[in-house]
Amino acid sequence: MSQLMQLKDVAESTRLGPLSGEVSAGEILHLVGPNGAGKSTLLARMAGLTSGEGSIRFGGAPLEAWATATLAQHRAYLAQQQNPPFAMPVWHYLTLHQPDKTRTGQLNEVADMLGLGDKLGRSVNQLSGGEWQRVRLAAVVLQIHPDANPVGQLLLLDEPMNSLDVAQQNALDRVLHHLCQAGIAIVMSSHDLNHTLRHAHKAWLLKRGKLIACGRREEVLTPSYLAQAYGLRFRRLDVEGHPMLISAT
Protein backbone atom coordinates (compact mmCIF):
# COMPACT_ATOMS: atom_id res chain seq x y z
CA MET A 1 0.00 0.00 0.00
CA SER A 2 1.28 3.46 -0.92
CA GLN A 3 1.95 6.05 1.76
CA LEU A 4 -0.72 8.73 1.92
CA MET A 5 0.26 10.78 4.96
CA GLN A 6 3.60 11.20 6.71
CA LEU A 7 3.97 12.72 10.18
CA LYS A 8 7.39 13.84 11.42
CA ASP A 9 8.06 15.05 14.96
CA VAL A 10 4.47 16.28 15.32
CA ALA A 11 3.85 17.99 18.65
CA GLU A 12 1.37 20.36 20.28
CA SER A 13 2.25 22.09 23.53
CA THR A 14 2.14 19.56 26.39
CA ARG A 15 -0.68 17.51 24.84
CA LEU A 16 1.08 15.66 22.05
CA GLY A 17 4.39 14.33 20.82
CA PRO A 18 6.73 14.66 19.31
CA LEU A 19 5.71 11.62 17.28
CA SER A 20 6.27 10.33 13.76
CA GLY A 21 4.44 7.81 11.61
CA GLU A 22 2.84 7.03 8.27
CA VAL A 23 -0.67 6.28 7.02
CA SER A 24 -1.10 4.17 3.89
CA ALA A 25 -3.93 4.13 1.37
CA GLY A 26 -6.52 1.43 1.97
CA GLU A 27 -5.59 0.70 5.58
CA ILE A 28 -7.56 0.99 8.81
CA LEU A 29 -5.48 2.52 11.58
CA HIS A 30 -6.75 2.69 15.16
CA LEU A 31 -5.51 5.21 17.72
CA VAL A 32 -5.80 3.63 21.16
CA GLY A 33 -4.86 4.63 24.67
CA PRO A 34 -6.40 5.94 27.89
CA ASN A 35 -8.35 9.18 28.18
CA GLY A 36 -6.03 12.14 27.79
CA ALA A 37 -3.59 10.18 25.62
CA GLY A 38 -3.82 12.73 22.80
CA LYS A 39 -5.96 10.83 20.31
CA SER A 40 -8.39 13.68 19.63
CA THR A 41 -5.57 16.21 19.47
CA LEU A 42 -3.73 14.06 16.94
CA LEU A 43 -6.81 13.54 14.77
CA ALA A 44 -7.56 17.27 14.67
CA ARG A 45 -3.95 17.93 13.68
CA MET A 46 -4.11 15.27 10.94
CA ALA A 47 -7.32 16.88 9.70
CA GLY A 48 -5.51 20.19 9.25
CA LEU A 49 -7.62 21.98 11.85
CA THR A 50 -4.75 22.87 14.19
CA SER A 51 -1.07 23.67 13.85
CA GLY A 52 2.03 23.09 15.90
CA GLU A 53 5.55 21.78 15.82
CA GLY A 54 6.68 19.18 13.31
CA SER A 55 5.38 18.51 9.82
CA ILE A 56 2.62 16.54 8.12
CA ARG A 57 2.60 15.73 4.43
CA PHE A 58 -0.63 14.60 2.77
CA GLY A 59 -0.77 13.39 -0.80
CA GLY A 60 2.83 14.48 -1.33
CA ALA A 61 2.33 18.09 -0.22
CA PRO A 62 2.61 19.86 3.16
CA LEU A 63 -0.76 19.70 4.89
CA GLU A 64 -0.77 23.45 5.52
CA ALA A 65 -0.38 24.09 1.78
CA TRP A 66 -3.80 22.63 1.00
CA ALA A 67 -6.63 25.09 0.39
CA THR A 68 -9.50 24.41 2.78
CA ALA A 69 -12.03 23.63 0.04
CA THR A 70 -9.63 21.33 -1.79
CA LEU A 71 -8.66 19.52 1.42
CA ALA A 72 -12.35 18.86 2.16
CA GLN A 73 -12.60 17.02 -1.15
CA HIS A 74 -9.72 14.70 -0.23
CA ARG A 75 -10.35 14.06 3.46
CA ALA A 76 -13.37 13.92 5.75
CA TYR A 77 -13.28 14.38 9.52
CA LEU A 78 -15.73 13.43 12.27
CA ALA A 79 -15.20 15.34 15.51
CA GLN A 80 -15.91 13.58 18.78
CA GLN A 81 -18.79 15.91 19.61
CA GLN A 82 -20.97 18.18 17.52
CA ASN A 83 -24.39 19.59 18.29
CA PRO A 84 -27.10 19.45 15.62
CA PRO A 85 -27.36 22.64 13.57
CA PHE A 86 -30.58 24.61 13.23
CA ALA A 87 -33.62 22.53 12.34
CA MET A 88 -33.40 20.81 8.96
CA PRO A 89 -34.42 17.37 7.68
CA VAL A 90 -31.84 14.60 7.86
CA TRP A 91 -31.84 14.23 4.06
CA HIS A 92 -31.01 17.95 3.70
CA TYR A 93 -28.14 17.73 6.18
CA LEU A 94 -26.70 14.73 4.31
CA THR A 95 -27.07 16.45 0.94
CA LEU A 96 -24.88 19.31 2.20
CA HIS A 97 -22.00 16.82 2.48
CA GLN A 98 -22.38 15.24 -0.96
CA PRO A 99 -19.92 16.28 -3.68
CA ASP A 100 -22.58 15.38 -6.27
CA LYS A 101 -25.95 16.37 -4.87
CA THR A 102 -27.83 14.65 -7.69
CA ARG A 103 -26.85 11.19 -6.43
CA THR A 104 -29.93 10.60 -4.29
CA GLY A 105 -29.59 6.86 -4.77
CA GLN A 106 -26.22 6.84 -3.05
CA LEU A 107 -27.58 8.94 -0.18
CA ASN A 108 -30.40 6.45 0.32
CA GLU A 109 -27.98 3.52 0.14
CA VAL A 110 -25.63 4.88 2.80
CA ALA A 111 -28.58 5.88 4.98
CA ASP A 112 -30.02 2.38 4.72
CA MET A 113 -26.67 0.78 5.57
CA LEU A 114 -26.54 2.81 8.79
CA GLY A 115 -30.19 2.23 9.68
CA LEU A 116 -31.36 5.73 8.78
CA GLY A 117 -33.71 4.95 5.92
CA ASP A 118 -36.78 5.81 7.97
CA LYS A 119 -35.19 8.90 9.55
CA LEU A 120 -34.52 10.98 6.42
CA GLY A 121 -37.60 13.16 6.91
CA ARG A 122 -36.94 13.79 10.61
CA SER A 123 -35.43 17.03 11.83
CA VAL A 124 -31.83 16.66 12.99
CA ASN A 125 -32.60 18.43 16.26
CA GLN A 126 -35.25 15.83 17.13
CA LEU A 127 -32.96 12.79 16.97
CA SER A 128 -31.64 10.65 19.80
CA GLY A 129 -27.91 10.65 20.52
CA GLY A 130 -27.36 7.41 18.64
CA GLU A 131 -29.41 8.57 15.66
CA TRP A 132 -27.52 11.86 15.44
CA GLN A 133 -24.20 10.00 15.63
CA ARG A 134 -25.22 7.80 12.69
CA VAL A 135 -26.34 10.85 10.70
CA ARG A 136 -22.94 12.46 11.29
CA LEU A 137 -21.22 9.25 10.21
CA ALA A 138 -23.34 9.01 7.07
CA ALA A 139 -22.43 12.62 6.24
CA VAL A 140 -18.66 12.07 6.32
CA VAL A 141 -19.00 8.77 4.43
CA LEU A 142 -20.93 10.57 1.68
CA GLN A 143 -18.32 13.33 1.61
CA ILE A 144 -15.48 10.90 0.89
CA HIS A 145 -17.28 8.02 -0.87
CA PRO A 146 -15.32 7.05 -4.01
CA ASP A 147 -18.46 6.38 -6.06
CA ALA A 148 -19.19 10.12 -6.08
CA ASN A 149 -15.84 11.60 -5.10
CA PRO A 150 -12.96 10.21 -7.19
CA VAL A 151 -10.36 12.21 -5.25
CA GLY A 152 -11.47 11.09 -1.77
CA GLN A 153 -8.53 9.58 0.11
CA LEU A 154 -8.74 9.84 3.89
CA LEU A 155 -11.42 9.46 6.57
CA LEU A 156 -10.63 10.61 10.12
CA LEU A 157 -13.04 9.52 12.87
CA ASP A 158 -12.89 10.55 16.53
CA GLU A 159 -14.61 7.83 18.59
CA PRO A 160 -17.13 6.92 15.87
CA MET A 161 -18.61 4.06 17.90
CA ASN A 162 -19.95 6.45 20.57
CA SER A 163 -23.69 5.97 21.24
CA LEU A 164 -23.94 3.01 18.81
CA ASP A 165 -25.35 -0.35 19.86
CA VAL A 166 -23.74 -3.64 18.82
CA ALA A 167 -25.75 -3.98 15.61
CA GLN A 168 -25.04 -0.37 14.62
CA GLN A 169 -21.33 -0.83 15.29
CA ASN A 170 -21.37 -3.89 13.05
CA ALA A 171 -23.10 -1.90 10.31
CA LEU A 172 -20.46 0.83 10.55
CA ASP A 173 -17.68 -1.75 10.38
CA ARG A 174 -19.14 -3.02 7.10
CA VAL A 175 -19.26 0.50 5.66
CA LEU A 176 -15.66 1.19 6.71
CA HIS A 177 -14.49 -2.12 5.26
CA HIS A 178 -16.11 -1.20 1.95
CA LEU A 179 -14.32 2.17 1.90
CA CYS A 180 -11.04 0.51 2.82
CA GLN A 181 -11.43 -1.97 -0.05
CA ALA A 182 -11.90 1.02 -2.37
CA GLY A 183 -8.56 2.48 -1.26
CA ILE A 184 -9.70 4.99 1.37
CA ALA A 185 -7.40 5.25 4.40
CA ILE A 186 -9.29 5.29 7.70
CA VAL A 187 -7.84 6.61 10.96
CA MET A 188 -10.07 6.36 14.01
CA SER A 189 -9.79 6.52 17.77
CA SER A 190 -11.09 3.61 19.79
CA HIS A 191 -11.49 2.57 23.42
CA ASP A 192 -12.44 -1.03 22.58
CA LEU A 193 -9.17 -2.94 22.39
CA ASN A 194 -10.84 -6.14 21.23
CA HIS A 195 -12.57 -4.28 18.42
CA THR A 196 -9.15 -3.01 17.35
CA LEU A 197 -7.78 -6.57 17.44
CA ARG A 198 -10.54 -7.69 15.08
CA HIS A 199 -10.88 -4.80 12.66
CA ALA A 200 -7.74 -2.63 12.50
CA HIS A 201 -4.81 -3.34 10.22
CA LYS A 202 -2.48 -1.23 12.34
CA ALA A 203 -2.60 0.53 15.69
CA TRP A 204 -0.86 3.42 17.41
CA LEU A 205 -0.82 3.17 21.20
CA LEU A 206 -0.53 6.51 22.99
CA LYS A 207 -0.19 7.67 26.58
CA ARG A 208 -0.02 11.32 27.67
CA GLY A 209 0.76 12.42 24.13
CA LYS A 210 3.61 9.96 23.64
CA LEU A 211 3.61 7.11 21.12
CA ILE A 212 4.34 3.91 23.05
CA ALA A 213 4.09 1.52 20.10
CA CYS A 214 2.96 1.49 16.48
CA GLY A 215 2.66 -1.20 13.85
CA ARG A 216 0.48 -4.20 13.12
CA ARG A 217 -2.37 -4.58 15.60
CA GLU A 218 -1.07 -7.84 17.10
CA GLU A 219 2.40 -6.32 17.56
CA VAL A 220 1.05 -3.26 19.38
CA LEU A 221 -1.73 -4.70 21.53
CA THR A 222 0.52 -6.87 23.67
CA PRO A 223 0.17 -7.26 27.44
CA SER A 224 3.50 -5.51 28.02
CA TYR A 225 2.71 -2.43 25.91
CA LEU A 226 -0.84 -2.21 27.27
CA ALA A 227 0.47 -2.36 30.84
CA GLN A 228 2.66 0.66 30.07
CA ALA A 229 -0.31 2.59 28.68
CA TYR A 230 -3.04 1.68 31.16
CA GLY A 231 -1.18 0.66 34.32
CA LEU A 232 -3.03 -2.68 34.33
CA ARG A 233 -2.03 -6.27 33.72
CA PHE A 234 -3.55 -7.82 30.59
CA ARG A 235 -3.85 -11.33 29.25
CA ARG A 236 -4.39 -12.27 25.62
CA LEU A 237 -6.53 -15.36 25.12
CA ASP A 238 -7.62 -17.36 22.11
CA VAL A 239 -11.41 -17.70 21.89
CA GLU A 240 -12.65 -19.87 19.03
CA GLY A 241 -9.67 -18.92 16.92
CA HIS A 242 -9.84 -15.19 17.68
CA PRO A 243 -7.52 -13.28 20.05
CA MET A 244 -9.16 -11.53 23.00
CA LEU A 245 -7.71 -9.20 25.60
CA ILE A 246 -8.85 -9.23 29.22
CA SER A 247 -7.72 -7.25 32.22
CA ALA A 248 -5.92 -9.49 34.70
CA THR A 249 -6.34 -7.18 37.70
From Swiss-Prot:
Role: Part of the ABC transporter complex BtuCDF involved in vitamin B12 import. Responsible for energy coupling to the transport system.
Cross-referenced NCBIfam families: PRK03695.1
Start and end residues of each ABC transporter domain: 1-233
Quaternary structure, from the entry: The complex is composed of two ATP-binding proteins (BtuD), two transmembrane proteins (BtuC) and a solute-binding protein (BtuF).
One GO CC term on file: ATP-binding cassette (ABC) transporter complex
Lineage: Bacteria, Pseudomonadati, Pseudomonadota, Gammaproteobacteria, Enterobacterales
Naturally occurring in which organism (per UniProt): Salmonella typhimurium (strain LT2 / SGSC1412 / ATCC 700720)
Highest taxon, organism lineage: Bacteria
The protein, known as: Vitamin B12 import ATP-binding protein BtuD
Protein's membrane topology: Peripheral membrane protein
Binding site for ATP: G33, P34, N35, G36, A37, G38, K39, S40
Family: Belongs to the ABC transporter superfamily. Vitamin B12 importer (TC 3.A.1.13.1) family.
EC numbers, comma separated: 7.6.2.8
Pfam families found in the cross-reference section: ABC_tran (PF00005)
Catalytic activity: an R-cob(III)alamin(out) + ATP + H2O = an R-cob(III)alamin(in) + ADP + phosphate + H(+)
Database matches in PANTHER family: METAL TRANSPORT SYSTEM ATP-BINDING PROTEIN TM_0124-RELATED, VITAMIN B12 IMPORT ATP-BINDING PROTEIN BTUD
